[in-house]
């Protein structure tokens, strides 16, 4: 999962060049990389974790996936109710063997066969299971289980062969980026030799079976561990001038974003072990929308920017500098905020949606087809969250109607939105007034964590909320303002504070 991807760092060289160098002809580096037949086109999917206090029921969750045009998901287990609910849909599913089941499966062929029978044969093909991820970051999080990894993978594969499902369903295991060393420049990358005894036969297995190398890649952690060296814009897929592009001095290939460099590092690492025909599948990548005081770059703005640009990057099909002919598919971590996860705060804040399906923020993915309907939701509103104490809500309400310059005239005594006369109702109106005034901008519905976005019109009776379709030709009075909440302004200024690139040769650490 996300937190385990920041386990270790190693020193490497990072170059910033002011002049545009002539890129090497990357076509000579291309290889016959194998991709599953049904997934020849790159896609974006989502990880679905279940450490959520108010998660939708399986049936509701599937309806939500269909409404959002999400066609690829990765589960961290093989939940039977969810697999049943996914039957006869177009949603393609990666199911998982949790780390704590590796011992049983890796040491017993019959246990592996039983697992395939219960979790695959019982549902396929009505449920479109495309792959099995065996464990999660086993080499770096539970190294004591490493010797069981390949036996478990092979036992599961043999069980698929026995059921004649081995060509439709692939078997692999997700790795943390920290299994690679010297990842920039990518041309120098290699797998940690500690794991060669496992990686060599694993890669040979992936090559033989046409399965992908699964990698969990997080530019967020690269930035957090290398602040001041790796510019934020490079991590967020933001447009760069040539002087800010990362250049591999060995190949002269230009890298406009960190994720591409990490993917190419994986390809080079495989090539160094004489494997050149295995595709990289990014099984986790994302950016948290909230963090504690030590995580100032975990903001809604940065999460929106990263994930929106990531989606566009995948659907642009431009590949990587090393493999322009090959675009890796990506599973965003994650669909829902897992509010039950242990600290730090960011661990509970990777989701695009809250567990009840209301969006944490709205992605901006225009031009990416029908993917993610939340991008095309024209009518969204900002309301007070349930369960927030009245004192905290009152403070946020006071800011919205004061420094925030929301139009709060409708919640005054005798006006149309005064009833119900309670702080939650008044706060919702004031929050939404501010949100609409700010053009529903990313980050304008937070109020220190007590507000949330909803697609349900909160208008009631004669009380019409700003932005409502019920407004018709009614003119809403708003006050233009460039002010934002103090906390939001601080995080925004900080998040751009490390974007100045000094054109020197430096040594730094990267995942």
Swiss-Prot record:
Its main location: membrane. One of its GO terms (molecular function) is glucan endo-1,3-beta-D-glucosidase activity. Its EC number is 3.2.1.39. It is an enzyme of class 3 (hydrolase). Disulfide bonds join 382-445. Residues 1-28 form the signal peptide. GO terms for biological process: carbohydrate metabolic process; defense response. It is a lipid-anchor; GPI-anchor. Glycans are attached at residues 109, 192, 274, 374, 378, 407, 473, 480. It catalyses: Hydrolysis of (1->3)-beta-D-glucosidic linkages in (1->3)-beta-D-glucans. InterPro entries: Glyco_hydro_17, Glyco_hydro_17_plant, Glycoside_hydrolase_SF, X8. It is found in: Cell membrane. It comes from the Eukaryota. Contains two additional disulfide bonds. Pfam families: Glyco_hydro_17, X8. The active site is at residues 137, 284. SMART domains: X8. PANTHER family: GLUCAN ENDO-1,3-BETA-GLUCOSIDASE BG1-RELATED-RELATED (PTHR32227). This is Glucan endo-1,3-beta-glucosidase 1. It comes from Arabidopsis thaliana. The lineage of its organism: Eukaryota, Viridiplantae, Streptophyta, Embryophyta, Tracheophyta.
């Amino acid at each position: 999962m996300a937190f385990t991807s920041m386990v270790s760092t190693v020193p490497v060289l990072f170059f910033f060049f002011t002049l545009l160098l002539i890129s090497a002809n990357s076509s000579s580096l291309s290889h016959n990389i194998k991709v599953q037949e049904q997934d020849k086109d790159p896609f974006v999917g989502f990880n679905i974790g279940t450490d959520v206090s108010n998660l939708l029921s399986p049936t509701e969750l599937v309806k939500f996936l269909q409404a959002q045009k999400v066609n690829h998901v990765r589960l961290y287990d093989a939940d039977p109710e969810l697999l049943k609910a996914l039957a006869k849909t177009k949603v393609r599913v990666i199911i998982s063997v949790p780390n704590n089941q590796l011992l049983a499966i890796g040491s017993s062929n019959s246990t592996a066969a039983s697992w395939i029978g219960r979790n695959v044969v019982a549902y396929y093909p009505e449920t479109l299971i495309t792959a099995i991820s065996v464990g999660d970051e086993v080499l770096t999080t539970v190294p004591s289980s490493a010797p069981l990894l390949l036996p478990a993978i092979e036992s599961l594969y043999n069980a698929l062969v026995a059921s004649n499902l081995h060509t439709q369903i692939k078997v692999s295991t997700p790795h943390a980026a920290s299994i690679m060393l010297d990842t920039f420049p990518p041309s120098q990358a290699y797998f940690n030799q500690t794991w060669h005894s496992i990686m060599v036969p694993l890669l040979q297995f992936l090559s033989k079976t046409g399965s992908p190398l699964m990698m969990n890649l997080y530019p967020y952690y690269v930035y957090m561990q290398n602040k001041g060296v790796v510019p934020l814009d490079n991590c967020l897929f933001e447009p760069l001038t040539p002087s800010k592009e990362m250049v591999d001095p060995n190949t002269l290939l230009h890298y406009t974003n960190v994720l591409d460099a990490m993917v190419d590092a994986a390809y080079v690492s495989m090539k160094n072990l004489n494997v050149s025909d295995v595709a990289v599948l990014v099984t986790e990548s994302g950016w948290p929308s909230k963090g504690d005081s030590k995580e100032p770059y975990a903001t809604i703005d940065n999460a929106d920017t990263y994930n929106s640009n990531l989606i566009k990057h995948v659907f642009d099909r431009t590949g990587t500098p090393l493999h322009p002919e090959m675009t890796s598919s990506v599973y965003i971590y994650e669909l829902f905020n897992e509010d039950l996860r242990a600290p730090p705060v960011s661990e509970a804040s990777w989701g695009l949606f809250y567990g009840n399906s209301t969006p944490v923020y709205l992605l901006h993915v225009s031009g990416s087809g029908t993917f993610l309907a939340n991008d095309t939701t024209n009518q969204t509103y900002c309301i007070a969250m349930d369960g927030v104490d009245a004192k905290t809500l009152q403070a946020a309400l006071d800011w919205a109607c004061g420094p925030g310059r929301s139009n709060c005239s409708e919640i005054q005594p005798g006006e149309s939105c005064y009833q119900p006369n309670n702080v939650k109702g008044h706060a919702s109106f004031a929050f939404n007034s501010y949100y609409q005034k700010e053009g529903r901008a990313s980050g304008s519905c937070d109020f220190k964590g007590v507000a949330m976005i909803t697609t349900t019109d909160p208008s009631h009776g004669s009380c019409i909320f700003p932005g409502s379709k019920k407004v018709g030709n009614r003119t809403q009075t708003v006050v233009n303002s460039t002010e934002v909440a103090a906390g939001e302004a601080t995080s925004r200024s900080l998040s751009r504070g490390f974007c100045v690139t000094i054109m020197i040769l430096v040594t730094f650490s990267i995942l």
